[in-house]
Amino acid sequence: MLQEHFFLSEDVITLAQQLLGHKLITTHEGLITSGYIVETEAYRGPDDKACHAYNYRKTQRNRAMYLKGGSAYLYRCYGMHHLLNVVTGPEDIPHAVLIRAILPDQGKELMIQRRQWRDKPPHLLTNGPGKVCQALGISLENNRQRLNTPALYISKEKISGTLTATARIGIDYAQEYRDVPWRFLLSPEDSGKVLS
């Protein structure tokens, strides 16, 4: 698994790119599911108006962002979808990387079951942050958890591919930060890793 020092960089933009291709792994009730990270978004706490911790705002919900890098920040979006963020940087520097999409690897049948996705397009199984959490069995119970236990971790194992940067999604309120290219996507080189 990735060691703690990997997550302690204060450059969340670069780290959001470096996470692409790494395998995200969960163990829930003894069952393993995993997928390669293929889409991320960077949120740079103090100055980023799209970030929950803009201007060092601290709330009950976003307290996990102030933990040391390598912690999980989970929150609920629209009251129903759980979203996983990887906290980065030193303690009290509220940077995070949102995991937006994965390519399923281990436990794909279990992911389909969790998502109730039988006989539906496979490329839509884990192509959104809420879908990732549902497929991997990630919930608010994982909030503040260190990403170095069998329950939830990121492996050193990595696939390569072509990286694309675009504006982040759903942040029209973020003024001058609305269009910064801090959303990163990986198109894997191995065609066998691409969902059809």
Swiss-Prot record:
GO terms for biological process, alphabetical: base-excision repair
This protein's UniProt keywords: DNA damage, DNA repair, Hydrolase
Top-level taxonomic group: Bacteria
Keyword presence, Transferase: no
InterPro entries (alphabetical): Formyl_transferase-like_C_sf, MPG, MPG_sf
EC number: 3.2.2.-
CDD domains noted in UniProt: AAG
Gene Ontology molecular function: any one: DNA binding
Annotated family: Belongs to the DNA glycosylase MPG family.
Stored HAMAP family: 3MGH
Name of the protein described by the UniProt record: Putative 3-methyladenine DNA glycosylase
